Amino acid sequence: MKHKEKYKMVFKTHDGEWHTHSTYDYKECVGYKDKLLNAYTCSEIKIFHYELVGLNIGQPRCVYNAEGLISLETAIEDVERVSPHMF
């Protein structure tokens, strides 16, 4: 089976390390991104779409860009500060 498109995710963890994940399936890419967001593990996530057929073969197009994401510890501190009566 010949794939028509590819997604490449580039993300930076809170310790400053960059990682990548590539897939040919959009749903898998979105699922992976959602898992990273829900775990508060990344400070930055970018997703690039590549066409593998047609006029724009191999040219990346940024389809998702999130910067300045907070860590789980920061999220907990923010909730405790805003709603101290909850704890």
Briefly describe each language-model feature range.
Residues 1-19, 45-52:
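Short aromatic-glycine-(Arg/Gly/Cys) micro-motifs in beta-strand/loop hairpins
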Residues 5, 20-24, 60-63, 67:
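A general secondary-structure boundary signal
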Residues 12, 19-22, 40-42, 73:
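Intrinsically disordered/low-complexity terminal segments and short unstructured peptides
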Residues 15-31:
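A short, exposed loop/beta-hairpin motif centered on an aromatic-Gly-Thr core
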Residues 30-38:
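Surface-exposed alpha-helical segments enriched in charged/polar residues
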Residues 37-87:
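Short, mixed-charge low-complexity intrinsically disordered segments
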